[in-house]
From Swiss-Prot:
This is Transcriptional regulator MraZ. Forms oligomers. InterPro entries: MraZ, MraZ_C, MraZ_dom, MraZ_N, MraZ_sf, SpoVT-AbrB_dom, SpoVT-AbrB_sf. Disulfide bonds: none annotated. GO terms for biological process: negative regulation of DNA-templated transcription initiation. CDD domains: MraZ_C (cd16321), MraZ_N (cd16320). It comes from Bacteroides thetaiotaomicron (strain ATCC 29148 / DSM 2079 / JCM 5827 / CCUG 10774 / NCTC 10582 / VPI-5482 / E50). Residues 7-54, 84-127 form the SpoVT-AbrB domain. The gene is mraZ. GO terms for cellular component: cytoplasm; nucleoid.
Length: 156
């Protein structure tokens, strides 16, 4: 199982090529993951990079919740899968971020790779603090979640 951790700053070149941080590359290699799936995040102005096996699990989960005979569900599935890029790191460990993604997420030059469990988020450096709470908000939210009385005893 892959678990990406960390917040690593890198620089994209003029063509949108960027080195995948070495710690993340090592994990991908250890898991024999060669292909990555890139898409615009559903909720944030960042890109999400999935190892192919993780993407397939996410896709299977989504598909299992959708009714293929429901037109709204068809639209949701189409939108989710239609704008993805399959990327393979080159021999130097670089990937190319397509221009449309650079524009949509306002990514230029310095960027941040943030490990989020089994996937990686790619942020414009100046927006990389946007998805975080203040330390006080984070502490209160975590306390609320971890002290939730509705959890089963085995989940603590």
């Amino acid at each position: 199982m892959i678990r990406f951790l960390g917040n690593i700053e890198v620089r994209a070149d003029a063509k949108g090529r960027v080195f995948i941080p070495a710690t993340f590359r090592k994990q991908l290699q250890a898991a024999s993951e060669e292909r990555l799936i890139m898409r615009k995040d559903v909720f944030q102005d960042c890109l999400t990079l999935y190892p192919e096996s993780v993407w397939n699990e996410e896709l299977n989960e989504l598909r299992s919740r959708l009714n293929k005979w429901n037109s709204k569900h068809q639209l949701i599935f189409r939108q989710f899968v239609s704008d993805v890029e399959v990327v393979t790191p080159d021999s130097n460990g670089r990937i190319l971020i397509p221009k449309r993604y650079l524009q949509i997420c306002n990514i230029r030059g310095d960027i941040r790779f943030i490990g989020i469990d089994n996937k990686i988020e790619i942020w414009a450096k100046e927006r990389a603090e946007q998805p975080f709470m203040s330390p006080e908000e984070f502490g209160a939210a975590l306390e609320e979640i971890m002290n939730d009385e509705n959890r089963q005893d085995g989940e603590r």
